[in-house]
């Protein structure tokens, strides 16, 4: 009811709450079940038994008639209720509970909503007090078609007497869970899983999986999974990892974007130091190849340390980094450009390109041989 006040659905929720406080007013005698079901069908809703209560309440109040219509006597009215298999005594109980709730609302000076509430407003209000009675339909064999996985691992079935025109949806909420031959859900209504995020945000348990670098977005992204009482509300939702663990996101950003250069071509062009550094690294790698040594170029950890020392601590994605670099490079054009000395190990300092230039090969002068005739 408190939630309904905030969501402007107080009028409807008072009717539903009072209906759930008494025994169902619809009679279903053993010897007249088919006739009762036929009479009750006009109250049924496609998606929600809660909505069915509202239809039934309106019919009960309109059936007697009033201004502008022929008003039935009490006897005629009670006869009409019996013909439609509506229990008179329970209707009175329902009205009594409704009146009591209405009085409490009036004492608090809460106003009933003037405009009819939407399906979402009504069911969000109801859901706030029934989060432990949600269910998710499993898929599989024929039995699973009526079976729902509930909170904390329980399994239940929709009640066979549910007043719905259509089969319940994938996600439902129940007014109550009743165990007879097996566990059944009564008072069923279809809900949307995103409503659970809104109403049950304080109960969601979230887990981040697979933090990874996304080249197109130029940021570190993780996949979020949220559960409510063990039920997976959503999974695989992309979340910016910098909002969760900025330090880890920054490290991954530097390694992937700056050290490895894993950026889209257009962003790569806007960061000229990358091309300059890659060109210089290629030259040092060429020296390694010519010298047949593997200890000329420093390892990636030292290149990472170079960037880590100069990049601001709060920068952990492509957008924020590019904005910072554009401003900082105006004052320091050589910002983030590596030098040859920074890329070569100290023990390889003596190696340079001139050491591998080819020296000219001397050609011996021709010798003259004298013949015997000349002699």
Per-segment meaning from a language model:
Residues 94-111, 322-335, 339-341:
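Accessory interdomain/linker segments of ATP-dependent helicases and helicase-like nucleic-acid enzymes
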Residues 1-220, 247, 251, 274-310:
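Second RecA-like catalytic domain
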Residues 361-369, 373-374:
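Residue-level detector of conserved catalytic or cofactor/ligand-binding positions
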Residues 132-141, 341-360:
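Long, contiguous regulatory modules within eukaryotic nuclear regulatory proteins
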Residues 209, 213-325, 332, 336-341, ...:
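Basic, amphipathic N-terminal segments
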Residues 161-164, 260-267, 371-373:
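Short amphipathic alpha-helical segments with coiled-coil-like heptad repeat character
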């Amino acid at each position: 009811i408190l939630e309904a006040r905030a969501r402007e659905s107080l009028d409807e929720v008072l009717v539903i709450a009072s209906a759930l406080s008494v025994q169902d007013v619809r009679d279903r005698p053993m010897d007249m079940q088919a006739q009762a079901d036929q009479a009750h069908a006009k109250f049924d809703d496609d998606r929600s038994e809660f909505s069915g209560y509202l239809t039934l309440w309106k019919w009960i109040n309109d059936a007697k008639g009033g201004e502008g219509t022929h008003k039935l006597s009490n006897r005629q009215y009670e006869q009409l209720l019996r013909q439609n298999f509506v229990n008179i005594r329970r209707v009175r109980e329902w009205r009594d509970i409704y009146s009591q709730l209405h009085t409490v609302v009036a004492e608090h000076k809460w106003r009933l909503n003037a405009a009819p509430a939407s399906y979402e407003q009504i069911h969000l209000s109801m859901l706030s007090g029934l989060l432990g009675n949600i269910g998710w339909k499993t898929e599989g064999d024929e039995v699973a078609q009526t079976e729902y996985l509930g909170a904390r691992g329980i399994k239940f079935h929709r009640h066979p007497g549910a007043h719905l025109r259509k089969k319940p949806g994938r996600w439902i909420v129940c007014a109550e869970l009743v165990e007879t031959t097996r566990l059944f859900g009564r008072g069923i209504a279809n809900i949307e899983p995103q409503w659970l995020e809104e109403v049950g945000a304080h109960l969601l348990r979230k887990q981040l999986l697979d933090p990874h670098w996304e080249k197109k977005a130029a940021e570190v992204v993780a996949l979020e999974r949220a559960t409510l009482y063990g039920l997976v509300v959503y999974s695989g939702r992309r979340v910016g990892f910098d909002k969760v663990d900025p330090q880890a996101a920054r490290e991954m950003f530097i390694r992937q974007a700056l050290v490895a250069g894993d950026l889209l071509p257009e962003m790569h062009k806007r960061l000229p130091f990358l091309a300059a550094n890659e060109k210089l690294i290629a030259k040092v790698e060429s020296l390694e190849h010519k010298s047949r040594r593997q200890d000329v170029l420093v390892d990636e950890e030292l290149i990472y340390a170079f960037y880590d020392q100069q990049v601001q601590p709060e920068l952990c994605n492509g957008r924020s980094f590019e904005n910072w670099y554009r401003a900082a490079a105006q004052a320091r054009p050589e910002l983030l450009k590596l030098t040859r000395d920074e890329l070569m190990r100290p023990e390889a300092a003596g190696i340079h390109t001139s050491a591998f230039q080819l020296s000219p090969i001397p050609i011996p002068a021709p010798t003259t041989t004298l013949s015997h005739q000349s002699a």
